[in-house]
Every structure is written in C-alpha cells, then in structure tokens.
Amino acid sequence: MPDAFPPCSILILAGGRGQRMGGRDKGLIDWQGEPLVAHVQRVVRPLSDDLVISCNRNQEAYRAYADQVVGDAEADFPGPLAGVIAGLKVARHEWVVLLACDAPRVDQVLIEDLLRLAKANDSAAMVRQGEYWQPMFSVLPKRVLPVLEQAWAAGERSLQKALLREAVQGLACADDDCRLSNFNSPELLQG
C-alpha cells in the first residue's frame, strides 16, 4: 500500500443469521466458483497485515481467509454493531476498513479513496449514496470504540446510528455503483 495511507486493519463482517439466504452463512456461499468471502479477501489482502473476520459460526472455515477470527460478546446474532465492537477490540492498527462478506465487487480504488478521506480529515469515512449512508463500506479510527460501546450499552443496535454519533466524512458514490452490490438473496447470486 502506498506510504500516503496509514497502516490499517481490515474487518470483514460475516456474523449474520442469513435469514434472506434460508439461514445459510452468506460469506461461505459460492459465487463464481468460490465463497463470497474469498472474493472480498482477495481484494483486501494486499492492503493489510491484519485481516479480521467477525463471525458467529463456522469460525474454522473463516480462518482460511483471516489473520484473526472473532465472535460477538453476546450470543444469538446481536447484529453488525456487535461485530464491529468485537473486531475493533482486536484490530492491530489505528485505522480499520469495515466491509461486509457479501460485497464481492468491492475494489481497492474504493478502499483507497475511503482511506485517503479518513486520513485527510482524521475521522471516520463512509460511502454515501445520495441521502443514504453505507456503513458496511467505511474506514474507522479505532478510537471510536468507546463511543460504539457506549451506544451499545445505551441500547442502540443500529451500526449506522452509532457511527454517526461521531464526525463522519461521506465518500459520494453513484446509486448504481456496482462495487457496492451486496448479495442478500439467492436470486442476486445468479447475476
């Protein structure tokens, strides 16, 4: 990674129930001949020496794609905010790139743009499509961990709302930017 970018950890969230996938673990579902998480891992691997996957099941399968695997502190799939908190606790670098396991079209250019924006403003950076924030495409300073923990303790479960408690820089992306496609149903995997 160019010197202009701070060292970063990568946090891939793969801890969901997969309800729209019939309960299947989305990150391990095949797309174009390999698991979805493998596509994301291949893009981000050159960017970091600390790839963390937050998952609540199939941890052994995910170990093949990560330097560290963590689970949520609470059982029963508490949601992405819990996964981010768990991942930030073990991340080795002060900046953390946050991605979902089911976004195989993400590319290094998008990640580098987020890192550049975060570093320039010394704050979190998140993709924004018009009025809509996309928290699963973010760069976070590790120092937001206490803010997220406080939000969790206060009953907040929305990752986006918790992240927006602090300054966040928006990286504008078009509504139809295919790099942001995530696969939330079996039908979307057919494309």
Curated annotation (Swiss-Prot):
Its EC number is 2.7.7.77. GO terms for cellular component: cytoplasm. One of its GO terms (molecular function) is metal ion binding. One of its GO terms (biological process) is bis(molybdopterin guanine dinucleotide)molybdenum biosynthetic process. Keywords: Cytoplasm, GTP-binding, Magnesium, Metal-binding, Molybdenum cofactor biosynthesis, Nucleotide-binding, Transferase. GTP binds at residues 13-15, 26, 72, 102. It is found in: Cytoplasm. Mg(2+) binds at residue 102. It catalyses: Mo-molybdopterin + GTP + H(+) = Mo-molybdopterin guanine dinucleotide + diphosphate. The N-terminal domain determines nucleotide recognition and specific binding, while the C-terminal domain determines the specific binding to the target protein. Monomer. PANTHER family: MOLYBDENUM COFACTOR GUANYLYLTRANSFERASE. Belongs to the MobA family. This is Molybdenum cofactor guanylyltransferase. It comes from Pseudomonas putida (strain GB-1). The lineage of its organism: Bacteria, Pseudomonadati, Pseudomonadota, Gammaproteobacteria, Pseudomonadales. The gene is mobA.
